[in-house]
Amino acid sequence: MVYQSEFALETEMMEQLKSNGYETVTIRNEQQLLDNFRSILNERHADKLNGDPLTDKEFQRLLTMINGKGIFESARILRDKMPLKRDDESEVYLSFLDTRHWCQNKFQITNQVSVDDTYKARYDVTILINGLPLVQIELKRRGIDINEAFNQVMRYRKQNYTGLFRYIQLFIISNGIDTRYISNNDGEIYKSHMFYWSDKENNRINTLNEFTETFLRPCHIAKMISRYMILNETDNILMAMRPYQVHAVEALIHQATETSNNGYIWHTTGSGKTLTSFKASQVLSEQDDIKKVIFLVDRKDLDSQTEEEFNKFSKGSVDKTNNTAQLVKQLKDKSLPLIVTTIQKMSKAIQNNAEALDQYKTDKVVFIIDECHRSQFGDMHRIVRQHFNNAQYFGFTGTPRFEENQSQDGRSTADIFGRCLHTYLIKDAIHDGNVLGFSVDYINTIKAQNIDTETDELVEGINTDEVWLSDQRVELIARHITENHDKYTRNRQYSAIFTVQSIPALVKYYDAFKKISKDYEHPLKVAGVFSYAANEERNEGEVDEAHSRGKLEEVIQDYNLNFGTNFSTDTFQEYFNHISKNVKKGVKDNKIDVLIVVNMFLTGFDSKVLNTLYVDKNLKYHDLIQAYSRTNRVEKETKPFGKIVNYRDLKQNTDNALKLFSQTEDTDRVLMRDYDEYKAEFVDALAELKAVALKPQDMDQVQDENEKKAFVEAFRLVSKLVLRLKAFDEFDFTKANIGMNEQEFEDYKSKYFAIYDEVKPKRGEVEKVSILNDIDFEIEILRNDRINVSYIMDLVRQIDLKDKAEQQRNRDQIRRMLDNADDPTLRLKRDLLREFIDDVIPELSEEDNIDEAYILFENAKRESEFNQFAQQQAVDEQVLKDITGEYEYSGIVNQDHLKELVGDKKLREKRQTKKAVTSFVEEVSEKYSS
């Protein structure tokens, strides 16, 4: 097959962009880029400059102010006005992007810009807006994996994007057939953040031709950068909105500004509704005819989470409304365009302070209601609507109410909000890779003819709790979870929630886990959370208050012992928040393995490091989808799906819910395939691998890069399928079961890593041109998360300093583990750790502290490396340490300090030294990280 070349693809794209209104300019180097930027800057500010273009000194002063910044800071400068003092001491404010009148910017394109900095690079197509390179397009010929283009962009970004290229907002990556966009950032950028563009009906726009015709039209790309990119002020990152988020906001804005009707947005759970609703609120609050935008949530625990998210998207945009009086004060203040509060507080404010709110009775006020299926069915909503005569209401929900799952008062979401303005269903989100599919297991735990396991209904009047909560069944399930949890969560890399039917059930399971913990070498860290009657009603089931408070106190005290905290039932909210952070952040080596709940955390709680849900209760429709969706947030390659383990027969309920909320009979688009299908796929992939290398050692003699690439691609697929197979109970890593045993897999893996190490540039070496440079090794899928630096250091601490024979056995065991290390940081520290256990450990006495000895050893080695490298490269050691310290803090090698370090060396030598220093700083920072 003959594929279109990269050059032909680039030429065709340039012509298409030109026909769409871009001006073609010839820019081949950085000086021409600066000259073009200066010319446009003068042209756009002719009036402000009074016809006097910027002088050389003035332009240099400007460059000093806007260059040398990180990506995030550059993005902030791009959207701001920059004061510049002119030579005559007058001051002028310069702007770089018109963020309100998108089409009034100047649009240009160029290609093949060369940058001759630390590394040489030539960029494919660059979109310039007002002379700044804001969009960089990287093309690969048809047939090439798009991930290779992604890796090349990431390499360029790390090595070459300096100066004005720091202003790149978006990367476009395409092989002609598959096209995606991704926001630029200072830190690591993940492939999972590459997005497809799509139309309003969520049909993907894949080809480069279609993408250029829609997404890259001048007005649209300027609008995308101006309105639909978020500066996340908490994490200091740039976020590009996904297409369905953009279409939803556009539809909502049109409905609010062009009509007086209400509406709702149906976007599946986990698709980023908070960001979408925030952007809609923000844009609406900027409209002149809208006097106030009020964002309503339902529950106290969600209020703080939503507030945190809003302030992440725009620092200080939300003032916390602690009480009704404070809310009334904020409502009276017309200078606050946006308020976040709960519908309960809003209802009280209207009931008790109606006269104070009369100013809004006829004003246009917009209410945005998050998770409206939880908050908008009831009397409170009616009270709010009666007071604001000219208000519009827009709901966001992942699980609307229909006839099948209508609210208690018999109304559907459409009955309250009217027309659905935009949909993005769970099948769409899974197809786009924005959420994960589900792998669902059903474990039969009872054999009884007296109970309907799907509905919990009595058949012959027996007590169902006696069946569901029998001691034997509860312990059976607790043991099943304990014995299979490592498999489901990839050796506890992820956490799980266990949802049960009631507080008594929660207490019984909690006690069962405590009881059996002594039977296991590595018991699970189990926590529980529930409310007693004195707390806010959370629909947790009826239970005696004194008993439940006493039990909750016991659970909290256990938590304090496990996690070094000091909570009690008197500080329940703080306890709740700490658990939330623990499960959300995934604190390494000190996280909750299983959190037992009744209803808490099953709605509105997002955690990327949660991948498993254990279920022992009846769930259906919206409750089932909401609960399942706690597990399906995208993280990285090691989390291919959300794992659901049902201890009741919820098969029909699962199918019904998925059909309703996917609007399809085809549930296979949401559920992962079964074990046999993955096994068959694995057998085929293994045959492909054997065709390339029948035995692992066959790769030892291979020199040809194409053969190495074929091996990498074949083994990578085998590894991905092993990762999926391991999540199934049927999996057995034996030749009889899947045609390969674990030792053979490890042998192939060592050859895979050998090629990876060969391709990875060594410190100070000039990077070789190789077809393997940009291949995606996806090292994450091969990592045994348990055997990492922390795990090895634990073993080192346990080395016997008294018994020399036992000490030798300990050291041999650690050495074997180091030889097979697949954790990247551990591989960097491997030689360091070997030297420590071989040279230092034998010299220690019983009285010595291994931790202290290692810290002294590592500090000395680090100091020695700095000294040797500084001498080799003839650079100042202290400046080198300063650059490293700054990199460890910010993740950026400061180019100004780098120039200072290399001094007056010749151009070629300067380039080589810069490259060597950059590699040294990155490697030594990772190697000696704690």
Swiss-Prot record:
GO terms for biological process: DNA restriction-modification system. The lineage of its organism: Bacteria, Bacillati, Bacillota, Bacilli, Bacillales. Pfam families: EcoR124_C, HSDR_N, SWI2_SNF2, T1R_D3-like. It catalyses: Endonucleolytic cleavage of DNA to give random double-stranded fragments with terminal 5'-phosphates, ATP is simultaneously hydrolyzed. ATP binds at T268, T269, G270, S271, G272, K273, T274. The type I restriction/modification system is composed of three polypeptides R, M and S. Residues 254-418 form the Helicase ATP-binding domain. It comes from the Bacteria. One of its GO terms (molecular function) is ATP binding. NCBIfam families: hsdR. Transmembrane segments: none annotated. The restriction (R) subunit of a type I restriction enzyme that recognizes an undetermined sequence and cleaves a random distance away. Subunit R is required for both nuclease and ATPase activities, but not for modification. After locating a non-methylated recognition site, the enzyme complex serves as a molecular motor that translocates DNA in an ATP-dependent manner until a collision occurs that triggers cleavage. Keywords: ATP-binding, DNA-binding, Endonuclease, Hydrolase, Nuclease, Nucleotide-binding, Restriction system. Type I restriction and modification enzymes are complex, multifunctional systems which require ATP, S-adenosyl methionine and magnesium as cofactors and, in addition to their endonucleolytic and methylase activities, are potent DNA-dependent ATPases. This is Type I restriction enzyme SsaAORF53P endonuclease subunit. Its EC number is 3.1.21.3. Belongs to the HsdR family.
